[in-house]
Regions:
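Accessory cap/linker subdomain of secreted extracellular hydrolases
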Residues: 167-174
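Basic, amphipathic N-terminal segments that precede the first structured/catalytic domain
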Residues: 1-2, 174
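A structural signal for short, hydrophobic/glycine-enriched beta-strand patches
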Residues: 2-165
Length: 174
């Protein structure tokens, strides 16, 4: 089925099964001068899911992979400034690619006592991770972004203090 239909069906299922204890949001490289559209949509999707009772907590996942900023820390700071309470957002800081995002965050969620877990990302990444999730994190449900539901027109993401996300002496993995 198409990515659009896959996202819509997953969202309909999530409506019936909400609330989740936590959602996992994979990181995207943070660029201080220009936030990417992928980062914007993932953060706005997390906010939508939090504001609409789909989840009580959010784990952002990602290390300093392609920029000198730890993706998950930057995303957490941004989401906190958008109104998701800081005590309900977490940063998983080791993951360097998609499968590590889901696996390390799933392990973190379990350590924190969360049992009802979902992955919240774009439909393409969600679909790519589906077989990995089934094999290694079978209790994780997908809630891919439904673009007709997401309202990214709400404005630009806030400017944040990136001091705590910056890695001195950073070396790209490429």
């Amino acid at each position: 089925c198409s990515f659009k239909r896959y996202a819509e069906k997953s969202y309909e299922r999530a409506i019936k099964e909400k609330p989740f204890d936590v959602i996992i949001v994979p990181g995207v490289p943070y660029e201080k001068e220009k936030t990417t559209s992928v980062m914007k949509m993932r953060i706005w999707w997390a906010k939508h899911l939090y504001d609409n009772g789909f989840t009580k907590n959010v784990i952002f996942s990602g290390s300093a992979v392609y920029s000198p900023f730890v993706e998950s820390i930057a995303m957490k700071i941004i989401s906190d400034s958008l109104g998701i309470p800081a005590e309900h957002t977490f940063a998983e800081t080791k993951a360097e690619h998609s499968t590590e995002n889901i696996y390390y965050s799933w392990k973190m969620a379990k350590r924190l006592g969360f049992t009802k877990i979902a992955l919240a990302t774009d439909p393409f990444q969600s679909r790519l991770l589906k077989s990995f999730i089934r094999k290694y994190c079978p209790d994780v449900q997908e809630i891919p972004i439904v673009f007709s539901v997401l309202e990214m027109d709400e404005g630009v993401l806030p400017t944040i203090d990136t001091t705590s996300a910056y890695v001195r002496g950073y070396v790209s993995i490429t």
